[in-house]
Amino acid sequence: TNPEWVIDTNVLISAALSARGAPGRLVQLVLERSALVFSQPTFDELKTRLYRPKFDPYISLELREAVLHDLSAAARWVEIGEPSRYCRDRNDDMFIETALAAQVGVLVSGDQDLLQAPAIPGLRILNPQQALAEALA
């Protein structure tokens, strides 16, 4: 198993909304057994997206604050500069840059742009189901 993981915003939000699916189970395992890695831009994106009104019916403001606090407190933080260009969607590049800066071997994403990014030496990009299987192995 990997000691540290970079997990993208959509997977973290899925985990916050439901503990039962692969994202929720994966995040739980990572918090219990290893560590999550953030850079300021990746955390800022999570914060911005988690507070979107469309999630109001599913998660209270108090729970959102608790999730952000707990993830932030449990994470290892890395500095990144202006990300290089890896993906079709420039917003995804910061996750790759964070993973490279932290020297983690795995980035978890459900985003097709990331999953189909050109190969990057030393980094595997897995979907939540693949990552969960690996975390449980």
Which positions does each model-derived feature cover?
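Residues that scaffold the ATP/ADP-binding catalytic core of kinase and kinase-like folds
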Residues: A15-A16, R49, Y58, A117, ...
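Short, flexible loop segments at the rims of nucleotide/cofactor-binding pockets, characterized by
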Residues: I13-A15, F55-P57, E82-R88
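Residues at secondary-structure transition points
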Residues: G21, V37, I59-E62, Y86-N91, ...
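Short, well-structured N-terminal submotif of metal-dependent ribonuclease cores
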Residues: T1-F38
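PIN-domain endoribonuclease scaffold, especially VapC-family toxins
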Residues: Q28-E82
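A secondary-structure boundary/capping signal
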Residues: D8-T9, S39, G110-D111, P128
